[in-house]
Design a protein with these regions (language model features):
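Bacterial N-terminal signal peptides that target proteins for export
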Residues: 1-8
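Bacterial N-terminal signal peptides
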Residues: 8-19
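Non-catalytic structural scaffold of enzyme domains
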Residues: 20, 24-253
Length: 253
């Protein structure tokens, strides 16, 4: 018969492993809030898949939708006080709710995100414009850049972001825009045909084509293969920026 001391030390050895197992299983997940002001199922799927593909499964995604912000911007023709205040309030609410980083998806509100950079730095909760790194990459890759959008309110903020990036990089760029009017909400094949038609001439004189809206991302490879030009869409760049922010905070490895 085995001694009591043998049984005691065997149980003690097993028990000593339990705290480490519990810590590993209950490790807090990094919280990533994604802020939308307009959505489609395709848009949400592309953005959230890009974030999950870039990061491990050990994150918690929180989606925030506030369509009134976009509607007010379109109605007023610019980002007025009311939509800007709503946007800021949603960001602060996510901070209070424990978000570690907030990803801003809508291009029409990019100027608000830029204006809030000092506040987000003070809060310690990065507010990431999904277009920021895409625009940086576009400037790296060429000097003749075409911005494509289905909403006119998305074009101006993207242009200003491109201008900032070109200044930071000491590079002169030429930016033109293409508005694919009526393109938002179309089925995939109809939209791809419309994009092919609208971009045939601009593609010839472009080094880089960037899509101003996440809802257009699924069409990027099609246009790239069709015209042999560099085509950038923002979901993967936004996801990489989220990863960099979480790494900087020491929340992931």
């Amino acid at each position: 018969m085995r001694s009591y001391s043998y049984i005691f030390f065997t149980l003690f050895g097993i028990a000593s492993l339990l705290p480490y197992t519990l810590v590993a299983d209950t490790q807090a997940k990094a919280k990533v809030a994604i802020l939308y002001t307009v959505t489609t199922p395709q848009l949400k799927s592309d953005v959230e898949r890009a974030v999950r593909d870039e990061l491990s499964s050990n994150i918690e995604l929180i989606t925030c939708e506030e369509a009134s912000i976009f509607k007010e911007i379109v109605a007023e023709g610019y980002v007025g006080q009311k939509p800007a205040a709503k946007y800021a309030a949603i960001y602060l609410e996510q901070v209070k709710s424990g978000a570690d980083v907030v990803l801003s998806v809508c291009s029409s509100v990019a100027d608000i995100a830029y204006a809030m950079r000092d506040i987000s730095a003070f809060m310690g909760v990065p507010l990431i414009d999904i277009n920021e790194e895409m625009c940086r990459e576009a400037v790296r890759k060429g000097s003749k850049i075409t911005v494509v959008a289905t909403f006119p309110s998305a074009i101006g903020p993207i242009g200003r972001t491109l201008e900032r990036k070109s200044r930071e990089m000491g590079k002169h760029i030429e930016v033109r825009s293409v508005l694919v009017d009526g393109g938002f909400g179309l089925d995939k094949e109809t939209f791809k045909s419309l994009m092919a038609k609208e971009l045939k001439e601009p593609a010839e004189s472009s080094d880089v084509i960037i899509f101003a809206q996440s809802s257009m991302a699924y069409c990027a490879n099609y246009i790239k293969e069709l015209y042999g030009k560099e085509v950038l869409s923002n979901p993967k760049f936004g996801a990489k920026a989220v990863r960099a922010a979480l790494l900087n905070k020491g929340l992931i490895k």
